[in-house]
Amino acid sequence: MPRSRRRLPGAGAKPPRREVYWTSQAERDRGHWRQSDRRILARIDRLVEDIPKHPFAGIGKPEPLRYEWSGYWSRRITGEHRLVYRVEGNTIFIAQCRFHYD
């Protein structure tokens, strides 16, 4: 006779839904990539899709920033460019997605 499987509380639960907001600087950066390099724009889109699922792990080698950027995280877009974001509760703020921590 098969044993019944008990579910642990929270097992299989979906992660909380997180809202993503873009700062005006991040919007300008995204517009730059839309016009100049669609491959980088696609990479940014993949990173932004992953952040709500895994804010502090996942693709792009996430790392916490320090000093004046304390509280923010970055992920690698390319060797030169980083996506910088902040997580506050269930809200994610994308600060920039061009250059290296301006």
List the predicted regions and their residue ranges:
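Enriched for short, Lys/Arg-rich terminal
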Residues: 1-19, 27-42, 46, 59, ...
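Generic structural signal for secondary-structure transition and capping sites
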Residues: 53-56, 70
